[in-house]
């Protein structure tokens, strides 16, 4: 059992993770004595080679919340199948809560045409040519998770 934990930590250290903070929000919890302030950080981690994850961290200060978000993001990493032109193999829809997202592959040289949280997720996944459209919700967290949902449902076709 000790060996498995050691292997997990070694694997984590070998991969060069890049992390970007999507949003930091001040949230409150109402308790008997008044309001308790804390911070919620939404963080995306990825290696720009097909692995990406979204994490959420909450703490009483911003830096701890971001660190917890990075740890959570590394626990929720998915692998994205990329084509030779660094795009996705086919069109896909992602959904999380009220957030809907349409992801379409695009021609080489087109770039990442996306906004907000989906753009950060797609760039950290290593996708270079893609079109995306957000529908429904404006929530950064839900749109990031809808992007992850869409990317996790991608399939590659073997002829």
UniProtKB/Swiss-Prot annotation:
Pfam families linked to this entry: Ribosomal_S5, Ribosomal_S5_C
Biological processes, Gene Ontology terms: translation
Described purpose of this protein according to its UniProt entry: With S4 and S12 plays an important role in translational accuracy.
| Species this protein is from | Emiliania huxleyi
Q: Where in the cell is it found?
A: Plastid, Chloroplast
Primary location class: plastid
Query: Cellular component per GO?
Result: chloroplast; small ribosomal subunit
* Every S5 DRBM domain range: 17-80
Copy the domain comment. Answer: The N-terminal domain interacts with the head of the 30S subunit; the C-terminal domain interacts with the body and contacts protein S4. The interaction surface between S4 and S5 is involved in control of translational fidelity.
The keyword Nucleus is assigned to this record: no
Binding partners and assembly: Part of the 30S ribosomal subunit. Contacts protein S4.
The alphabetical list of record keywords is: Chloroplast, Plastid, Ribonucleoprotein, Ribosomal protein, RNA-binding, rRNA-binding
Record-given protein name:
Small ribosomal subunit protein uS5c
**Gene3D superfamilies the UniProt entry points to:** 3.30.160.20, 3.30.230.10
Which NCBIfam families does the protein's record reference? rpsE_bact
Molecular function terms, GO-annotated: rRNA binding; structural constituent of ribosome
Q: Which family does it belong to?
A: Belongs to the universal ribosomal protein uS5 family.
Keyword Cell inner membrane in annotation: no
Q: Which InterPro entries has this protein been placed in?
A: Ribosomal_Su5_D2-typ_SF, Ribosomal_uS5, Ribosomal_uS5_bac-type, Ribosomal_uS5_C, Ribosomal_uS5_N, Ribosomal_uS5_N_CS, Ribsml_uS5_D2-typ_fold_subgr
Alphabetized PANTHER family for the sequence: MITOCHONDRIAL RIBOSOMAL PROTEIN S5
């Amino acid at each position: 059992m000790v060996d498995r934990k050691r292997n997990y930590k070694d694997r984590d250290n070998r991969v060069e993770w890049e992390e970007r903070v999507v949003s930091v929000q001040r949230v409150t919890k109402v308790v008997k004595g008044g309001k308790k302030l804390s911070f919620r950080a939404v963080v995306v981690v990825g290696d720009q080679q097909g692995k990406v994850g979204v994490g959420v961290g909450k703490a009483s200060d911003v830096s701890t919340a971001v660190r917890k978000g990075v740890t959570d993001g590394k626990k929720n990493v998915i692998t994205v199948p990329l084509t030779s032109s660094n795009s996705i193999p086919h069109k896909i829809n992602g959904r999380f809560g009220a957030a809907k997202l349409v992801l379409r592959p695009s021609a080489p040289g087109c770039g990442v045409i996306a906004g907000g949280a989906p753009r950060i997720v797609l760039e950290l996944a290593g996708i270079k040519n893609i079109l995306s459209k957000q529908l429904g919700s404006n929530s950064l967290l839900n749109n990031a998770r809808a992007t992850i949902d869409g990317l996790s449902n991608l399939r590659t076709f073997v002829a």
